[in-house]
Amino acid sequence: VNESAEYSSGNIQYLPGLALNWTVSPNATSYTFSLRQGVTFSNGDPFNAYQVWAQMYMIYFVTANSSSWLDSYNVFNMNTANFGPSTISLMNQSGLANPGQALLSIMDNNSWPIYVTGPYQIVFQLAHPFQYFLGLTIVFAGLIFDSQYVLEHGGPGTATAINSFFNQNPIPGTGPYEFSHVAEQSYALFTQNPNYWGANLTPQQIQANPFLDPGHVKNVVINYKTDDISRYTDLSTGKAQVAVIEAQDWNSIVPNPKFVYYQVPKYSALEALFSLNTKLYPTNITDVRQAIVHAINYSDLISKAFLGQGQELIAPEYPIYGQYYNTPGLQPYQYNLTLAKQYLSEANITNMPSITYTASSTTVWQGIAGQVIQADLAQIGITVNLNLVPYAQCQTYQGTYTYNLQLLKNSSVASQIAIPGCGPWGPSELTPADAWTDFVSNRSTIGNVADYSNPVVETAINSFFDSQNTTYIQGLLTKAQTQLYNDAPLITIGLGLWLVDGSIVWQKGVINSFLVDPLTTGTDTMPILNTITFG
């Protein structure tokens, strides 16, 4: 519902989009959104609260009615909602522009966690206080699409058979551009939306929320090219105005004054992480993990794998949440071979087995990082076997916390060192609970490749969801952060380049400016099309 957020000096501001405004109950369990009137989707279908209601419950339905359907956050009591095929059938009969009484009696039922109070007002009733709920509304389920169009083209499908019609036929949205044509694995053509509600916004209104800009060109073509040389050639010849350039051609970008590349701001959430498995021998021994984190030359790792642009962080919180980041004031793990050997000696392992580093072969940096770690750990007597597999295969080795524990039974896929997400990590949601929940919690749906869970840490994570007292949360996080630091299940590198070993590049004077995904690649890696301005 809430279309956009904006970073400002390390703070996060939530800006009105399709929601003109919202109110929050004193106990942070009820969020009421007043929606913008007179808005249509690009195909002319009206936008209203009924559309939003339908979208939320259809997403709930295709997740097999999972309690954590909203971006993996279990914030609703879904037991009071009875949404299923019969409800979808009723929506088909009634439509969403002016629902009939039978459907309306369901939509405005305030015993359900999400309900409407009129055509332009919708309420989200949480099961417990969560003061960061707005951070869930700017991603995935909160990116509003035309539910009426979904109904008219076969419905959403089911959890085991999601409707594939929309793969080649994108669902209309309310934004400044619409799809004109899509050729999968080839290109996508966007055209300015003739029905865009913000087409006549004043410069002052756009300045207040630049994500609402109607755009500065009529048509945008996005070509899908996997070859870095082809992308560099298109950029350097002017065939493309913006391109992704990676390590292969990066040395042609940096020294050339005609090129400009996007650098990740100081306040960011873009990271590369290395998990040390806490359940698999020998990294299930804390002293072994401490030996590993002190045996790695981080300056060398950043120089070789991340093109010199990055910094070691204190896991797991993102630095953008300054009030919750590294509350004990710890120092990042230091490269110290003497200390590493001491920890390894204290582990008291007679015959150290080799360990496995599993990562994706699809991107160069993961292999380079593996080689650096391999060489560093060899200095303290640990042999590292590199297991580089295609990205799609790597993804099958990771999942929920429970799924990851089950994988340990399969020695062919279990590994002591792995990269969460098999690539760089941008947050799934814009909340300070995100990193803690994803990387070090037993409620994790993706990211906890370390198979880590500790009662002190879990208690601190729970405080995000049952307290509004920042001081109280910080106190618990200080204990959790110290526990986590001593347990050493994670190494975190804050990235300086948008794509780890490359970035978005443009020619100076051709492109003036643009905005990017506030979730730092968590939702999208491209420039936000309507915000691109030209020189």
Question: Where is each model-derived feature located?
Answer:
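N-terminal lobe/hinge region of extracytoplasmic solute-binding protein
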Residues: 1-26, 172
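Gly/Pro-rich hinge or "lid" segments in bacterial periplasmic/extracellular proteins
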Residues: 4-9, 125-130, 136-219, 229, ...
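Aromatic- and charge-enriched surface segment that lines or borders ligand/interaction sites
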Residues: 20-86, 123, 231-234, 282-284
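Short helices/loops that flank or line small-molecule/ion binding pockets
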Residues: 44-45, 229-240, 287, 371-380, ...
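Alpha-helical secondary-structure segments
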Residues: 48-57, 119-129, 175-176, 214-219, ...
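Extracellular/periplasmic solute-recognition and catalytic clefts
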Residues: 66, 180-191, 221-280, 410-411
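Surface-exposed binding/hinge segments that line
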Residues: 69-154, 183
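Detector for C-terminal structural segments
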Residues: 183, 187, 270-271, 293-325, ...
